Structures are given as structure tokens and as C-alpha cells.
């Protein structure tokens, strides 16, 4: 009954604990990418208000398939972006928690991440784009967290 929310690696670990095999994605997702809420996700207390789609900050090169018995909530062009396990456990691939400072720090360290370099994103473009988008995305993240807290018994 305790609500769980796994983000990126945390989502991968939650999915793995539920029986999914975490694997390298076909390509890394770095930066801002569209995420489509599934029909099941439209009814979800966390992701439903984001339907039909939203743009999310991503920084991952691994993915997880839908664990047995899980409900698919969101997808990107590359991979599953979220699922619910049971009534109160969510595994998300995107980063609703990322702050402006964190995102800009990751972008500053871009060259140190071989997956970031090979994904073809230009950090000189990603930094300003993040500056433009992060405030709205932070509102989305805070609202998502409030909805998650409201699921607690």
C-alpha cells in the first residue's frame, strides 16, 4: 500500500524487480522529447492529466519493457516512458524531478558522457532550449509529485 515512484534508473530498478529485463535502448534519449500518454495512461491518477502528450526532459541510454501485469502509461518514439505496477507503484523513464541547475550541470558535462555525444544532440542548442522549457516542466513535475503524494492511504 505504500506509494512508490521510480524515476529513470529508479524506474528501471522497479521494473526489474517486477520481472522486466532492463536493456540498452535502440538509441539514447538526451534532452527534450515528446511523450505520448497511452489510453490506459489517460485514466491514471499521475499521468492522466498530462494526456494526450507532453514534452519531457530525458537523459538515458537504457530502457525497460513492460513488466508482467503492469499497465502501460506513456511512450516515446524510443521506449516505454512509464507504467504502473499495482495500484500505487509507478516506474517512469523521464526526469520530472530535474531542476534547471541539474539539467545545466548534465549539459555542461555532456562531453564526458559517450552516449550523450553519440546521440547527436548539440549541447550548445540544448542548454538554451532547456532554459526556455524548464520552468514549465518543473510545474509539470511538481504537479505530478502532488498527485503521487495524494495516492498515499
Predicted segment positions?
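Cysteine-nucleophile active-site neighborhood
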Residues: 1-41
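Amide-donor transfer/coupling interface in amidating biosynthetic enzymes
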Residues: 23, 38-153
Amino acid at each position: 500500500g505504500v506509494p512508490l515512484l521510480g524515476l529513470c534508473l529508479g524506474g528501471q530498478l522497479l521494473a526489474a524487480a517486477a520481472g522486466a529485463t532492463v536493456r540498452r535502448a535502440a538509441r539514447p534519449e538526451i534532452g527534450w522529447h515528446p511523450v505520448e500518454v497511452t489510453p490506459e495512461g489517460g485514466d491514471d491518477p499521475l499521468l492522466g492529466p498530462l494526456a494526450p502528450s507532453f514534452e519531457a526532459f530525458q537523459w538515458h541510454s537504457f530502457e525497460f519493457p513492460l513488466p508482467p501485469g503492469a499497465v502501460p502509461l506513456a511512450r516515446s518514439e524510443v521506449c516505454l516512458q512509464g507504467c504502473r505496477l499495482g495500484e500505487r507503484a509507478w516506474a517512469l523513464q523521464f526526469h520530472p524531478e530535474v531542476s534547471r541547475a541539474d539539467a545545466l550541470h548534465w549539459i555542461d558535462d555532456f562531453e564526458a558522457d559517450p552516449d550523450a555525444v553519440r546521440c547527436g544532440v548539440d549541447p550548445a542548442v540544448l542548454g538554451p532550449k532547456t532554459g526556455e522549457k524548464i520552468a514549465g516542466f518543473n510545474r509539470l513535475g511538481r504537479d505530478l509529485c502532488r498527485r503521487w503524494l495524494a495516492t498515499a492511504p
